[in-house]
Amino acid sequence: KEVDPTRPYTSSSPLFGWGREKSYTEGDSHYWGTWWGLADIEAVQNRTGRFVSEYGMQAMPNYSTTKKITLEEDRHLYSDVLKAHQKAGNGFLKLNSYLHRYFKDTTNVKTWSVKDYTYLTQCLQHYSFKNIIGVHRSKEPYNMGTLLWQLNDCWPVASWSITDYYNRQPKAAWYA
């Protein structure tokens, strides 16, 4: 309206920001209560907007990618190399919290192999997307759209993407 008052325009993406009640009834919604807010995956049942245009769950890159970007001595959780490829604030702690709630006791997570950790985080990401997308679909016609974050990465990293940076086998979440 500031540039061209003759054209209709609606500010959006998102109109109200995640976590604000109006974001569930007007415009599109970014729901990050799962992941950034550490809410249970099932919380989305009561947090579905009219069009949910951003939400996600992290996972490690495919193990073959981890092997390509690390030396053998760096293939342990919390190595400097793996930490450099995890850019989300407290990313590993968030993943561990969800793994503990949904899959396995993480008390001894430091003793797990990176291969096992990768597998479990990808199972978690698949479980998250499958359930969240299922809830969104069940809310039709109230909810008429869902866009997950994100499709791909710009470098090999632990992230929200559902495809592998090197275009290998997609992560498990691809099939959700």
Q: What are the language-model segments listed below?
A:
Residues 2-20, 141-153:
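Aromatic-lined carbohydrate-recognition surfaces of secreted/lumenal glycan-active proteins
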Residues 5, 27-28:
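A general marker of short, structured functional hotspots
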Residues 23, 30-176:
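Substrate-binding clefts and catalytic carboxylate motifs of secreted carbohydrate-active enzymes
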